[in-house]
A protein has these predicted regions:
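An extended acidic
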Residues: 114, 119-123, 128-192, 278-330
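Short amphipathic alpha-helical coiled-coil/interface segments
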Residues: 407, 411, 418, 613-624, ...
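Acidic/polar, glycine-enriched structural segments that form the non-catalytic walls/loops
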Residues: 59-86, 92-97, 185, 190-198, ...
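N-terminal secretory signal peptides and thylakoid transit peptides that target proteins
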Residues: 24-46
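Mature N-terminal segment immediately following signal peptide/propeptide cleavage
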Residues: 84-117
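Short, solvent-exposed loop/turn and secondary-structure capping segments
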Residues: 103, 113-117, 123-127, 137, ...
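Active-site core of glycosidic bond-cleaving carbohydrate-active enzymes
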Residues: 463-506, 523, 544, 548, ...
Length: 796
């Protein structure tokens, strides 16, 4: 609870019987909670009303509401429920809400660069430096910071009086931020400044055009409007420090160099290091040992101004003066060099003369080109067999200047198509908050979670620098990339899952590509994704090439079936352990991929295998009913493995995941409807809580991705008397992966929320999604970074 001032729920807890002589001994684990804990929670909840603009979600609650830790009656506020469905207004943040914002504004698979709430670029993870994250940023969000000097400022002159204002919170008293990925709009106002400034920031994002969506570039498009009654002279400056080899520190013997370049429709300053590598398009086959001996941060970067005018000025160096004033004062110069131990900052200035009420726009670019991505530098043993290296964008462009030149030549189209996607997405009757939340996590592709090697191979961490290998049992929860950039998913199926990763003759798919063995949920997910990619591909040639290995992978799972349409034996899964017995959610995924395999077999004229898969799936649809225990699906635990983790008769979040997947690809039902809906209702009753604090007060193990006072759906609870967290932990595993049961994780919640909506439980599905959304309010943490085991976690 400590430090969590901005509660999403902001409910009041009533203690009308805390000291009554009529109180009986507590009937549940919650009896361990003392009055002080409730008072703390109540106090912080009240603070939520003061410090946070979020509506009250639920309550008031009594102590008795929490007798089962997760209250059965969620007591959702009618106003809050109404807000779930209302179209509402565009989400705009101001004041202190701006401080934690970091929206990805680089190309997909091109590094990670954030746009801050006041328009400053930060984070700058473009230099190929190994950086691990572990989930801790949920509780301790990153503080905006930059390893280099970069920014924008405006100089306004009226009747000879001049003022210089940085385009940050330091320069303007009223700044508003509206982030609708991939576009962000920032407004700058100040009563002492006779102009307003509007910033539109983005990187080209064009679904179905992966290359143009993967440009290593950020667009910053400033529109200045004269709000006074007099003519104003305006100068707009942008500057960029030469940070090439910033981390490898070549010493004073090396010189950084800035060069002004003029091209068709562009004025730019390119930064490099003297005697660096020749500018050339990188060929994958030429990623030699000599190339990999280059410093990882060797390359080029540039700041550019599109459609330059004769009055525009570029200075390769602003000298030693203070920024931003030095950017305006610097004399034009086409070349500058500086020893590596000293800063070298270049600036470009646009001049405008604006009559009263008039406006003008200047479009700046920041581009980069650091080709020497080398995954071996991570020193992870399981990546020893990973041979792919280099940046894909370097196979298209020889330098940052070339990237800027390409964007200058095609800017009208890139801008229009990015806006078209944005406008199409938001041209909806769906709530703004819902459109924001279900699109913004696609920014994971523009984070350091996602990479595209020089060979064209897509490769991802689970979260930034955490758990390698485009893990099958994590990435199969995500669908955005497949729908927006299906060529990347097709390549991932062909090159990795059914290529590098599949073992012959078993058909097992190593769940981390080059490493680790079979994960049954990931295996099923690969087969289902193959069917999805087939649906997203014209003709049947793609499937025809992969079908033998897809069939082999399906047969691998069939061998784990003892004839009843259910999986048995050792079943490693995304909860990082091998489970034994008949597991509802794993067998449900098995049934879904059987249906998908049958459809693919039919398309491949493999009628015998199609019939076999359908017969097994029909059998399994009946067999899985035996795991339905009155309210929800449980597992039949194999008693021969008492040491194994198993949720047993617990209410586990993914129990009907197979049916959720079936909806995604239009398959017939794999789990009966009545039981499926009852299971989802049980998840709402037993796992969704308006305040996770009460549960975590009892079950302390595990990471915190929902704090006291925050709503969420718990991974697994134990409503039955015959099974508990201790049973589920197995013998000797109390401090191990069983702690995952106590956690709240976004990617799992999205899966359930989507499934609820499929099944007609729209209010509950929206409530679960809104809980994720509200946990990521910028008064608390960065809305654009959904954290699990690492930043920008791919499951989301």
């Amino acid at each position: 609870v400590t430090g969590n001032r901005h509660n999403i729920i902001a409910h009041k807890i009533i203690y009308h019987n805390m000291h009554s002589s009529k109180n009986t001994p507590a009937k549940s684990a919650l009896s361990a909670l003392d009055r002080r804990f409730f008072l703390k929670t109540s106090a912080f909840a009240a603070a939520g009303l003061t410090f946070c603009r979020l509506p009250v979600m639920a309550g008031p609650f009594t102590r008795e509401d929490f007798d089962q830790i997760v209250p059965a009656d969620k007591k959702l506020s009618p106003e809050w429920v109404k807000s779930l469905f209302a179209r509402g207004e565009r989400t705009v943040y101001r004041g202190k809400e701006l401080e934690k914002i970091g929206m990805p504004v680089g190309g997909i698979c091109a590094g990670q660069i954030y746009l801050g709430g006041d328009g400053k670029l930060w984070h700058w993870d473009i230099f190929n430096q190994p950086r691990r994250t572990d989930g801790s940023t949920y509780q301790n969000p990153l503080v905006p910071a930059s390893p280099l000097e970069q920014g924008f400022a405006i100089e306004v002159t009226v009747d000879g009086e001049k003022q210089v204002r940085p385009l940050t919170q330091a320069g303007f008293s009223d700044i508003s931020f509206c982030g609708e990925y991939p576009l962000a709009n920032i407004e700058y106002r100040d009563p002492k400044v006779p102009v307003t400034v509007s910033l539109e920031a983005f990187s080209p994002f064009v679904p179905l055009n992966t290359d143009d969506s993967g440009l290593p570039a950020t667009v910053l498009r400033y529109t200045v409007r004269n709000t006074s009654s007099a003519k104003v002279e305006v100068r707009l400056a942008g500057w960029l420090e030469n940070a090439v080899c910033h981390f490898s520190a070549p010493g004073d013997a090396a010189k950084r160099r800035n060069s002004v370049k003029r091209g068709q429709g562009v004025l730019l300053i390119q930064s490099d290091v003297e005697n660096g590598p020749a500018e050339q398009v990188l060929k994958p086959e030429l990623m030699s040992e000599a190339d990999l001996r280059q410093p990882l941060d060797m390359g080029t970067m540039a700041i550019a101004l599109l459609e330059p005018q004769t009055s525009d000025r570029a200075a390769a160096s602003v000298g030693a003066g203070n920024l931003p004033e030095a950017a305006f004062a610097a004399a034009p110069a086409d070349q500058a060099a500086q020893t590596a131990g000293r800063k070298l900052v270049g600036a470009i200035v646009r001049t405008m003369t604006l009559d009263a009420g008039k406006e003008a726009t200047a479009t700046f670019l920041v581009t980069w080109h650091f080709p020497y991505l080398d995954m071996q530098k991570w020193k992870i043993e399981r990546m020893e067999n990973l041979k792919d290296n280099g940046r894909y964008y370097a196979t298209k462009f020889p330098s940052a200047a070339a990237v800027a030149g390409y964007m200058a030549a095609h800017f009208a189209t890139l801008h229009a198509q990015t806006r078209l996607w944005h406008d199409t997405w938001y041209d909806s009757t769906l709530p703004y908050w819902f459109l924001d939340r279900t699109m913004l996590n696609t920014g994971c592709l523009a984070s350091a979670t996602s990479h595209r090697f020089a060979t064209g191979r897509f490769w991802g961490w689970e979260g930034v620098g955490c758990c390698e290998g485009t893990c099958t049992h994590v990435w199969h929860y995500a669908h955005a990339m497949a729908r927006l950039f299906p060529d990347l998913e097709r390549d991932l199926r062909k090159r990795t899952d059914f290529g590098t990763a599949i073992e012959k003759p078993s058909g097992a798919i190593r769940h981390r590509g080059e490493g680790f063995g079979l994960a049954v949920d990931g295996q099923a997910g690969c087969i289902l994704r193959a069917y999805r990619e087939h649906q997203m591909t014209a003709g049947g040639l793609w499937l025809k090439e992969l079908w033998p290995n897809i069939k082999l992978a399906m047969q691998c799972l069939i061998k784990m079936d003892r004839g009843d349409g259910m999986l048995d034996g050792h079943q490693h899964n995304t909860l990082d352990a091998g489970w034994y017995g008949q597991i509802a959610w794993l067998s449900g995924l098995y049934l879904a991929c059987l249906r998908a395999a049958a459809e693919m077999a039919t398309d491949m004229k493999d009628d015998a295998f199609a019939a076999e898969c359908r017969k097994i799936a029909d059998t399994g649809r009946e067999s899985i009913k035996k795991l339905f225990d009155q309210e929800y699906f449980i597992n039949l635990v194999d008693p021969k493995y008492p040491n194994a983790v198993n949720s047993g008769t617990g209410c586990e979040i993914d129990q009907v995941f197979g049916q959720s997947w079936a909806y995604q690809v239009g398959l017939e039902r794999v789990i009966p409807q009545k039981e499926t809906r009852l299971a989802l209702q049980a998840l709402w009753r037993y796992n969704f809580t308006p305040d996770c604090g009460a549960y975590r007060k009892i079950y302390k193990g595990g990471r915190f991705f929902a704090l006291a006072g925050e709503a969420g759906m718990l991974m697994c609870t134990f409503p039955r008397k015959d099974w508990s967290f201790e049973n589920a932990s197995g013998k000797g595993n109390m401090d191990g992966v069983c702690n995952l049961f106590n956690e709240v994780m976004n990617g799992f919640e999205y899966q359930v929320a989507g499934h609820m909506i499929w099944e007609g439980m729209v209010q509950q599905g929206l409530a679960v999604t809104r809980a994720v959304h509200d946990r990521h309010h910028p008064s608390k943490r960065n809305p654009w970074n959904e954290v699990e085991c690492g930043d920008h976690y791919s499951r989301s």
